[in-house]
């Protein structure tokens, strides 16, 4: 496969998961931040819940977050030290990142991460909970807990929760090189 690469399997994510359980109020917390505008939920329909640790930003109201390099740590960033340890050890130059939760039986349809921000970034997933199918272009894999993967987010990609529990994955971007 050229658009999905398994980096490692069997990573112990139990401490990361425990911190998620300890701070359930962090899910969706970026919606309550001052001076933060969320994309129109009628235009961007999804059943995914988000816990952003480093989110994109804009400097002007008419700017698209996909076309800026602005990265802002959310208040939840400080609480989730276990995932930060993982990132600092393995990918210390990470940029935007967060946890995504997909309910049982749900899917995220094929989409491309658009904007200049993504042109020089690699995107990774670390699976925290549940089993899911991930598809990129015409390739697909089944992802289990503790799997770290890279994928080409510049072509259509999406996911289906195959498990009997909410799928949680940690998504993060790293500049090329």
Language-model features: locations:
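Short, surface-exposed charged micro-motifs
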Residues: 98, 125, 158
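Asparagine-centered strand-capping/turn motif at beta-strand->loop junctions
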Residues: 159-163
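Conserved short histidine dyad/triad with adjacent acidic residue
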Residues: 99-118
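A short beta-strand-loop-beta hairpin characteristic of the jelly-roll/cupin
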Residues: 109, 125-144
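Non-heme Fe(II)/2-oxoglutarate
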Residues: 1-90
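A short hydrophobic beta-strand segment most commonly corresponding to one strand
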Residues: 122-127, 148-150, 164-177
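Short connector loops at helix/strand junctions that flank enzyme active sites
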Residues: 92-94, 103-105, 119-123, 129-131
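Conserved metal-binding segment of the jelly-roll/cupin
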Residues: 142-156
């Amino acid at each position: 496969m050229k658009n999905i690469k398994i980096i490692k399997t069997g990573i112990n994510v139990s401490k990361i998961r425990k911190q998620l359980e300890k701070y359930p109020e962090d899910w969706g917390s970026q919606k309550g931040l001052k001076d933060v505008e969320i994309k129109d939920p009628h235009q961007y329909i999804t059943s995914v819940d988000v816990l952003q640790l480093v989110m994109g930003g804009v400097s002007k109201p008419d700017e698209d977050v996909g076309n800026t390099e602005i990265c802002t740590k959310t208040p939840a960033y400080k609480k989730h030290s276990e995932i930060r340890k993982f990132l600092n050890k393995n990918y210390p130059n990470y940029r935007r990142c967060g946890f995504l939760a997909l309910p049982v039986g749900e899917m995220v349809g094929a989409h491309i991460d658009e904007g200049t921000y993504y042109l020089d970034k690699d995107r990774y997933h670390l699976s925290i909970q549940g089993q899911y199918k991930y598809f990129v272009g015409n390739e697909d894999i089944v992802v289990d807990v503790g799997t770290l993967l890279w994928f080409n987010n510049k072509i259509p990609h999406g996911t289906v929760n195959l498990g009997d529990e909410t799928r949680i994955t940690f998504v993060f971007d790293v500049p090329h090189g």
